[in-house]
């Protein structure tokens, strides 16, 4: 059996500080920032269009909403976006990863419904 060497008070303090820093970063990362919501609004607006970039963004957003129903998203498709839209997609991806919230929980059910009807159901009134 291996005897563990006790940590010095300095090392204990250092580890505690590190854990507090990690917890603080996690807490901050899970907060949704206004710039992320603005990026999401811009992506939704483009996804409601009828261009190639609109189709890519519809796939991206609908994969977030419900990938088993609407299909996944190939991350290499981000390469097909203009720089500004790619930056917005990365901001939204960060929000998705850290905030762990669905579009519906953020008040976007109606907008995502319009995108789904247009791109998955061929709604002529889109």
Regions found by a protein language model. Name each.
Residues 49-53, 67-70:
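Alpha-helical structural elements of signaling/regulatory helical domains
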Residues 8-51:
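Short terminal alpha-helical segments
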Residues 36, 40, 53-58, 86-89:
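Short runs of predominantly hydrophobic/aromatic residues within well-ordered alpha helices
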Residues 56-67, 91-95:
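Short, hydrophobic/amphipathic alpha-helical patches that form generic packing surfaces
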Residues 70-126:
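Polybasic, proline/glycine-rich intrinsically disordered low-complexity segments
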Residues 4-5:
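Eukaryotic low-complexity, non-globular regulatory regions
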